[in-house]
């Protein structure tokens, strides 16, 4: 009301001023056109300016909401790093060996006697305690009906020779790399949760399946990495160096120098064990969790060769020539499985 009354009084005064100017112009002998022009210029220069509308209540609510938003945003970043992480997987394989005996023949393997529940506390006979892991022969002649008169294809001669899968420790690994022989090395050196998280921050291009919010990952990786996400303008990675950086034990193993890492991916436990198989290249490492290794010969070789199945666990390194085997990993157990897939070839 006050504003409206003020505007009315202003326009009344302007009207009086216009009348006074008009009278003065006539007295001075000015023409009507000149008087109108002078009045128009006067009104344009002295037009009353209306100030911006004031809404104090709305402005106060806006400030309160903005303050609350900043407080919640800050609290999210402060609380998120202390949220509980998934439990770190533990090396364990004793409870699954019994159910796998009918798939593979591990009777002569010392590690079987170590983990079999019925043999706990029973010492190994003779001098077998001092022997390295023997060759693991999962083939069974009773299950393989091979026609001797049928010629063996050239690309099937390797698996048809029934070379056993060699299970060994790092210190017992052959000095020379054998490309034709499947190999499993029991290092007993799994990846810790902190190592996996640091690796995913430093090399996001070679990690997959680690589902995590954008803000959560950024906060966890800061300040070690300002932008922990893959971007196209980054220079190519030295994947051979990354493999040995993540698994230093490779510097002591006889694999080629150009052996490299393709990708590390996380697999959650399947509702039904063995329901999903994950194919990898010729070289792989189990970072954490438990799995079943399956080596399957090419389709044209299955009349002459048989598949291989063996349980593997955290820290195990496996190799099988890609020209003679298809390598599959099947998750088992209740812990998430971290697989690092690599190759001994110069190109993936």
Swiss-Prot record:
InterPro entries: BRAP
GO cellular component, one term: cytoplasm
Keywords on record: Cytoplasm, Glycoprotein, Golgi apparatus, Membrane, Signal-anchor, Transmembrane, Transmembrane helix
Residues annotated as transmembrane: 59-79
Protein's membrane topology: Single-pass type II membrane protein
Annotated compartments: Golgi apparatus membrane; Cytoplasm
Source domain of life: Eukaryota
Topological domains annotated Cytoplasmic: 1-58
Modifications made to the protein after synthesis: Glycosylated.
A GO BP entry: fibroblast proliferation
Signal sequence segment: none
Stretches of the chain found on the membrane's Extracellular side: 80-348
Subunit annotation: Homodimer. Interacts with BRS3. Interacts (via N-terminus) with SIN3B.
Protein role: Exhibits histone deacetylase (HDAC) enhancer properties. May play a role in cell cycle progression and wound repair of bronchial epithelial cells.
PANTHER family assigned: BOMBESIN RECEPTOR-ACTIVATED PROTEIN C6ORF89 (PTHR35259:SF1)
Protein name listed in UniProt: Bombesin receptor-activated protein C6orf89 homolog
Originating species: Rattus norvegicus
Phylogenetic placement of the source organism: Eukaryota, Metazoa, Chordata, Craniata, Vertebrata
């Amino acid at each position: 009301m006050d504003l409206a009354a003020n505007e009315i009084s202003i326009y009344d005064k302007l009207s009086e001023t216009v009348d006074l100017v008009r009278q003065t112009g006539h007295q001075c002998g000015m023409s009507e056109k000149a008087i109108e022009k002078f009045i128009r210029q006067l009104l344009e220069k002295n037009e009353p300016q209306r100030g911006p509308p004031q809404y104090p209540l709305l402005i106060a609510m806006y400030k309160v909401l903005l303050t609350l938003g900043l407080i919640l945003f800050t609290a999210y970043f402060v609380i998120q790093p202390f949220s509980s992480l998934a439990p770190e997987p533990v090396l364990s394989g004793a409870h699954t060996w019994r159910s796998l005996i009918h798939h593979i023949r591990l009777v002569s393997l010392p590690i079987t006697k170590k983990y079999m529940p019925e043999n706990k506390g029973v010492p190994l006979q003779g001098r077998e305690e001092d022997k390295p892991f023997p060759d693991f022969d999962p083939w069974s002649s009773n299950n393989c009906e091979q026609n001797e008169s049928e010629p063996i294809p050239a690309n099937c001669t390797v698996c048809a020779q029934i070379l056993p899968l060699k299970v060994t420790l790092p210190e017992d690994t052959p000095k020379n790399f054998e490309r034709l022989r499947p190999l499993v090395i029991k290092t007993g050196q799994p990846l810790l949760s902190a190592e996996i998280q640091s690796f995913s921050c430093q090399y996001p291009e070679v990690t997959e399946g680690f589902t995590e919010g954008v803000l959560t990952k950024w906060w966890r990786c800061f300040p070690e990495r300002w932008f922990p996400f893959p971007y196209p303008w980054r220079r190519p990675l030295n994947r051979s160096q990354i493999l040995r950086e993540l698994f230093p034990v490779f510097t002591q193993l006889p694999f080629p120098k150009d052996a490299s890492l393709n990708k590390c991916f996380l697999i959650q436990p399947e509702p039904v064990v063995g329901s999903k198989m994950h194919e990898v290249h010729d070289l792989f490492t189990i970072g954490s969790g438990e799995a079943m290794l399956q080596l399957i010969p090419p389709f044209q070789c299955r009349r002459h060769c048989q598949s291989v199945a063996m349980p593997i666990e955290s820290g195990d390194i496996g190799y099988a020539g890609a020209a003679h085997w298809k390598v599959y990993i099947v998750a088992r157990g209740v812990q998430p499985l971290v697989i690092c897939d690599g190759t001994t070839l110069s190109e993936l």
